[in-house]
A protein has these predicted regions:
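Bacterial N-terminal signal peptides that target proteins for export
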Residues: 1-8
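Extracytoplasmic metal-acquisition and chelation regions
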Residues: 9, 16, 20-324
């Protein structure tokens, strides 16, 4: 993934690479000097974000369908081919797309420009509590898996991602650079407004109830932004493919019983069976609450877009933890 991060930084330095300027792989003639970019995006969440920037100005193909677990998703042969003919590929990074790393590397080796969204933000290590120390340069350079890839749970960090993507799109389509800058600035403002809205939604939760327990460690950035403490996760680490030991579960149940948690938050992209088992051990008064943390939701879910998803998650957290 280091190669892809360097590619993103080189792009922002206005160096021509792969599909930047001219007729790169998969380039499509545009109108009035603008290029109709062919953009491939890994996750449904990033797909919505990039789609907001590229609407009517490029074709955006999202590899992961709604509801797919980004930790385990693997590309098909046709999707691998789409990666290699794209003008621009947008990935999350930090090891999130581990099941498709080989296909992404192959596209980069073919000269396709691969931009890593996580390269535009300050990454946090797994297990950071509210108010905890930020990672230094040494921590950021550790092997993948140490840093948390779930950057999208913080809309302010996503605003920084949008600014970075705007620059990437402008470099790939310099004739219409101003269009990309304007679009990214407008969408960035929407995300900053969303942050204020979420803060207001969560205001009903008193400080003593700002504690999160999750199915897997997906809400570290959310906790950092909005002043929550992450008490623990049922599945260790940030990978939904991991499995807790009986001793891990017993220790977690003990901790949660002592603290008196109200809810366990489980993602919609993975089984909630373990969360339900823990809740049954804890007894009445504790519920499992489904959150959209790995994918957008389908029609009628309230999470059809990134903005809607974040609002819905905030409302569900507030409903579960708010009040006395």
């Amino acid at each position: 993934m280091r190669r892809r991060r360097v590619a993103a930084l080189v792009l922002l330095g206005s160096v021509v690479l792969g599909g930047c300027g001219g007729e790169g792989p998969g380039a499509t003639p545009g109108v009035g000097g603008c290029r109709a970019l062919e953009i491939v995006v890994t996750t449904s969440i990033l797909g919505d974000v990039v789609g907001n920037l590229a609407a009517g100005a490029g074709a955006v193909e999202v590899l992961m369908p709604v509801g797919a677990d980004p930790h385990s998703f693997q590309v098909s042969a046709s999707q691998a081919a789409a990666l290699r003919r794209a003008d621009l590929v947008v990935v999350n990074g930090l090891g999130l797309e581990k099941g498709m790393g080989g296909a992404i590397e192959a596209a980069a080796a073919d000269g396709v420009l691969v931009v890593e969204a996580a390269s535009f933000v300050e990454a946090l290590p797994f297990g950071l509590m509210a108010g905890g120390e930020r990672p230094g340069a040494e921590e950021r350079d550790r092997p993948q898996g140490t840093l948390d890839p779930h950057i999208w749970t913080d809309p302010v960090r996503m605003a920084d991602v949008v600014t970075g993507l705007g620059k990437a799109l402008a470099a790939a389509d310099p004739a219409c650079a101003e269009r990309w800058r304007e679009r990214s600035a407008n969408y960035r403002q929407e995300l900053l407004s969303l942050d204020e809205e979420i803060d207001a939604i969560l205001a009903v939760i008193p400080a003593e109830h700002r504690q999160l327990v999750t199915n897997h460690a997906a809400l570290g950035y959310f906790a950092d932004r909005y002043g929550f403490e992450v008490l623990g996760a049922i599945v260790p680490g940030g990978d939904t493919l991991a499995a807790p030991s009986p001793a891990d579960l017993a220790a977690l149940v003990q901790t949660l019983r002592r603290v008196g948690v109200r809810a366990i938050f489980a993602e919609t992209t993975a089984s909630a069976d373990l969360a339900e088992a823990v809740v049954s051990e804890l007894g009445e008064g504790v519920v499992v609450v489904a959150l959209f943390t790995g994918s957008l939701g389908g029609p009628g879910s309230g999470a059809e877009t990134y903005l809607a998803m974040q609002r819905t998650n905030a409302e569900r957290i507030a409903a579960a933890l708010g009040g006395s």
